From Swiss-Prot:
This is Ribonuclease P protein component 4. The gene is rnp4. The keyword Nuclease applies. Its cofactor is Zn(2+). Zn(2+) binds at residues 62, 65, 85, 88. The keyword Nuclease applies. One of its GO terms (cellular component) is ribonuclease P complex. It holds the Pfam family Rpr2.
Amino acid sequence: MSNNNYERLITKKDVYRVANERLYYLFSLAFQTGDERYIDLMERIGRRMDITLPQDIKRMYCKKCKKPYKNVRVRLKKNVITVTCLECGDIRRFQINR
């Protein structure tokens, strides 16, 4: 007779919750240190777990040089925010609704 009452089953929801916590932790480390390896780890965890990165994290680092947006130029024109990374020169545009 097994002790099924005492065994805890790990559900998919638990796995996604832990992965999401890890994403936020790695992003905080990346933002503190400015190191792109934490961003790379975040993306790998997201791909492995088939999780899309949260929008607030996605918009806080450069997709080209993988550095957190610390050294950027932000411009607002009509309904578009233009973010220019001053490390690599990459330009990202985000539409906003007013």
